Amino acid sequence: MILPILGGPTGSGKTSLTQVLDPKRFEIVSFDSRQVYRDLPVGTTAPTPEECSTIRHWLIGFLNANESINANQFSLLARNAIADIQSRGKIPFLLGGTGFYLRAFLLGMYPVPTVPKETKDYVFTLPLEEARSQLLAKDPKAMESLSDQDGYRIKRALEVVLTGVLWSDVSKETVGGFWKDNPEVKIVGHWLDWPREILYQRINTRVETIIRGMLEETKEVLSKYGPDCPGLRTLGYNFALAFLNGMIDSNTFIEQLAQSHRNYAKRQITWFKKESFLSPISYDAAVQLYTNIEQR
């Protein structure tokens, strides 16, 4: 069984590439932790209804902004989607920018305990330096496997430690994993690689096109669910909230939003470079490769 996978940083053209795939052969399984929200399609740059009508997308826009999902739940949904696609003789095409979700799906997850919402909320508010300091104090060995600047994983480890379980204990071995359960699968995995200057130009241009719609959807979500809902915690919406609250002007909003997307792209690239099942590929080469891939 062939399993095509394409990762890439924000702004790299992942969605546009899906538009050249044959919808009679492929369906897209999205691995994007931000595009799960139906209320926030603009700020998360989710595929448009027109793009989704060209080729079917799974795991896009299925949560309200007041709902949340974790990597384990996402992995189960992805398994179901892949089984459905294969049952109809099509090829599931895994696509997205959330490397953690992709890795968890393929290789499994650490058997971590359930973390109370209050603990998650507390850790979320901590500056990275404070979270790192607390983790070092409570579980020094945990930091041996974590980058000092990996805010997501540091805070995730701290959440677990605050439940009374050492991250250094539970992170020794993963359980589950689609690839581990199906070793016959042959992954054809790449991530879209652009010269950094061109990628940043693409990101800056994209930000200018989404700000109006992003502000409108932020207002709507605010009126429905309030400022603390999970959807508004995703990338960039803190700047939209700051602008709507009069804390920053429009120029600052645009500058900070663009910078946050560029920083996010840099983190995504760092993650993808570390994955042994993915290798860099240019956009044109990816089109050539994936449009001609054959299922076996």
UniProtKB/Swiss-Prot annotation:
Catalytic activity line of the entry: adenosine(37) in tRNA + dimethylallyl diphosphate = N(6)-dimethylallyladenosine(37) in tRNA + diphosphate
Annotated ATP binding sites: 8-15
SUPFAM superfamilies to which the protein is assigned, alphabetical: P-loop containing nucleoside triphosphate hydrolases
InterPro entries given in the database record: Dimethylallyltransferase, IPT, P-loop_NTPase
Cofactor: Mg(2+)
Residues bound to substrate: 10-15
Documented EC number(s): 2.5.1.75
Keyword vocabulary terms for this entry: ATP-binding, Magnesium, Nucleotide-binding, Transferase, tRNA processing
GO molecular function list: ATP binding; tRNA dimethylallyltransferase activity
Residues marked Interaction with substrate tRNA (site): 98
A Pfam family of this chain: IPPT
Region entry Interaction with substrate tRNA, spans: 32-35
One GO BP: tRNA modification
Keyword Magnesium: yes
Family as reported in the entry's similarity comment: Belongs to the IPP transferase family.
Biological role: Catalyzes the transfer of a dimethylallyl group onto the adenine at position 37 in tRNAs that read codons beginning with uridine, leading to the formation of N6-(dimethylallyl)adenosine (i(6)A).
Subunit-structure text: Monomer.
Xref: HAMAP family: IPP_trans
Name of the protein this chain belongs to: tRNA dimethylallyltransferase
Species of the source: Leptospira biflexa serovar Patoc (strain Patoc 1 / ATCC 23582 / Paris)
Highest classification ranks of the organism: Bacteria, Pseudomonadati, Spirochaetota, Spirochaetia, Leptospirales
Gene giving rise to this polypeptide: miaA
